[in-house]
Amino acid sequence: MSLILLPAVDVVEGRAVRLVQGKAGSENDYGSALDAALCWQRDGADWIHLVDLDAAFGRGSNRELLSEMVGKLDVQVELSGGIRDDDSLNAALATGCARVNLGTAACENPHWCAQVIAEHGDKIAVGLDVQIVDGQHRLRGRGWETDGGDLWDVLENLDRQGCSRFIVTDVTKDGTLDGPNLDLLASVSDRTNVPVIASGGVSSLDDLRAIAKFTERGIEGAIVGKALYAERFTLPQALAVVRM
């Protein structure tokens, strides 16, 4: 099974940006979010990981734009950012996206999250945004501004609720081009039987080769952001590596 690559388009005020370690104010602007997504589609992407950072930070939303983008793309879209209640969930699903990624809600409102998982099944993934502090694996919420509890406790609860997929990010790696946290990915994939998508730190084709070795252990895909925008490699090059 080949590793699925999901180019990331993180949106702030309609622009495609990349943050460093998820910190507001660390944005690098890469132009129109729609143009970025269409570029990755032209380059061969099967999926786009589309994130409303304004909604994630609770400072507004790009809801109309994201809906327009999903409508104009021919590839599958995983939609994320600020989806924490029925209104934001229904708006996300109404775009026609293939999958919605919940983050903060899994920590702050586990009862609602369980209901959503039960109702929508594999259209729901949960993002596990992890920060390792003094050896403890802590989850981060609200745009990585708040503590969301112990990773392993939350993972066990979500597994029990029937969550169909997890997106695992080491927040200290995201946007740094420092390489992925392979130990974290292995630990999570070994504790669940559902697919895991890796996120954060990919900087080279060798990083993708390393992640691809974990497909038999349940790593289904990898989100790639900064490395593509910084032209460390092209998407066609990356796809060729993981499809070998």
Swiss-Prot record:
Keywords: Amino-acid biosynthesis, Aromatic amino acid biosynthesis, Cytoplasm, Histidine biosynthesis, Isomerase, Tryptophan biosynthesis. Coiled coil: none annotated. It is found in: Cytoplasm. GO terms for cellular component: cytoplasm. The active site is at D10, D129. The keyword Lipid metabolism does not apply. SUPFAM superfamilies: Ribulose-phoshate binding barrel. It catalyses: 1-(5-phospho-beta-D-ribosyl)-5-[(5-phospho-beta-D-ribosylamino)methylideneamino]imidazole-4-carboxamide = 5-[(5-phospho-1-deoxy-D-ribulos-1-ylimino)methylamino]-1-(5-phospho-beta-D-ribosyl)imidazole-4-carboxamide; N-(5-phospho-beta-D-ribosyl)anthranilate = 1-(2-carboxyphenylamino)-1-deoxy-D-ribulose 5-phosphate. It is an enzyme of class 5 (isomerase). Its EC number is 5.3.1.16, 5.3.1.24. The keyword Amino-acid biosynthesis applies. Pathway: Amino-acid biosynthesis; L-histidine biosynthesis; L-histidine from 5-phospho-alpha-D-ribose 1-diphosphate: step 4/9; Amino-acid biosynthesis; L-tryptophan biosynthesis; L-tryptophan from chorismate: step 3/5. It comes from the Bacteria. One of its GO terms (biological process) is L-tryptophan biosynthetic process. One of its GO terms (molecular function) is phosphoribosylanthranilate isomerase activity. Belongs to the HisA/HisF family. NCBIfam families: hisA-trpF (TIGR01919). Involved in both the histidine and tryptophan biosynthetic pathways. PANTHER family: 1-(5-PHOSPHORIBOSYL)-5-[(5-PHOSPHORIBOSYLAMINO)METHYLIDENEAMINO] IMIDAZOLE-4-CARBOXAMIDE ISOMERASE (PTHR43090:SF2). This is Phosphoribosyl isomerase A. It comes from Mycobacterium leprae (strain TN).
